[in-house]
């Protein structure tokens, strides 16, 4: 799949992994629609990249449809990169009692259902496009986490939501094979996201030192590099790739 002159949607595109991916796509000649709840940051990045910003709650069907409509108005939609998500920390039973059910539901709703919502809507639009010379119509890249495999204390909701994203990768890829649309998932380790960058420097350094090699936090641009490789390599389909420097998370 070539990026040049094609249209790509990036959810969670206003910051972090999504913003790095949007920059990569534009650098490769792609047209980008940024979808995010953060209006101010999203509009600023869209202006910088000459992209389109649509304020979007990924759990909303109407918002998702508006994003896809904006993308198809730009040209031929060829890809969706799902980076929107939340990462709460709460024990199953803590000092204040049981894990709030609303928080668990919200986490699953955004991370899992929001991912599926955007994927199904984008896939429907891509399925109606003419195939490329290689026979491909599009690619969907979802974002899980190493927590899907090595969930830590306090990550029951987050790990469950991300494990489900990894779990639906293969069946979704099989579903969409008849439409010539690929589905891949990236499971990042500890990355320089806005949440982590708000921590004290000594904490960030200690977290980076936990990574076998390279012994540092991952950079958003490295996520974007993998997204680029997935987009360009048509044989990559139906798999979750850990991008984590060989880390295996300890219980806490």
Question: Where does each model-flagged region fall?
Answer:
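Active-site helix of classical SDR
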Residues: 119, 161
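Alpha-helical segment proximal to the catalytic Tyr-Lys
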Residues: 124, 173-175
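Residue(s) in the substrate-gating loop at a strand-loop-helix junction
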Residues: 145
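C-terminal substrate-recognition "lid" of short-chain dehydrogenase/reductases
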Residues: 219-243, 248
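The beta1-alpha1 cofactor-binding region of Rossmann-like NAD(H)/NADP(H)-dependent oxidoreductases
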Residues: 39-40, 56-66, 101
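Conserved mid-core segment of classical short-chain dehydrogenase/reductases
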Residues: 87-105, 124, 128-134, 154-157, ...
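Canonical Rossmann dinucleotide-binding motif of NAD(H)/NADP(H)-dependent dehydrogenases/reductases
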Residues: 2-32
